[in-house]
Amino acid sequence: MEISRMTSCSDAEFQQIEALIGVLSTSCKANREIIGEVLSKEDSHLFIAKDIEGRIVGMTTVCCFTIPTGRHATIEDVVVLPECQGTGLGRRLVEEALDYLRSTGKAYKVGLTSKPARVAANALYRKMGFKQKETNVYTLDV
């Protein structure tokens, strides 16, 4: 498996990303324009994992931001195709994102969220050293 930071997205690659987002959530859809924005912004980075045939089988997004307390980042949308789950690919994607943040200095604190139902993912994040916070997460469509 090869993991890299995506800089452009062909139609075929967009369809593969669309399939991955379907694995992550049945209520979310991939948006070609938004993918283009993610790839063009300096504060967002899409990491993809390709198998030996060049098919995208996993991905994660890193979003960087600066607030008065410092440079922070969130890791979002860590997802691997079902047939590739349990192979360590999710860990490798998160490690690649963390290595990027460390090497660029874009963030000194990283957060992520995961649904409680994603038992294996939550166990992975704890094993990697992420600490579960006692907090509520609120969202609002604007």
Regions found by a protein language model. Give the residues of each.
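Short amphipathic alpha-helix that is part of the acyltransferase structural core
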Residues: 1-30
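Active-site rim helix/loop that mediates acceptor-substrate recognition in acyltransferases
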Residues: 26-46
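Conserved beta-strand in the GNAT
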Residues: 48, 55-64, 74, 79
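Conserved acetyl-CoA-binding loop-helix of GNAT-fold acetyltransferases
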Residues: 80, 86-99, 123, 127
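Conserved active-site alpha-helix within GNAT-family acetyltransferase domains
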Residues: 91, 103, 116-134, 140
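Conserved GNAT acetyl-CoA-binding A-motif
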Residues: 102-114
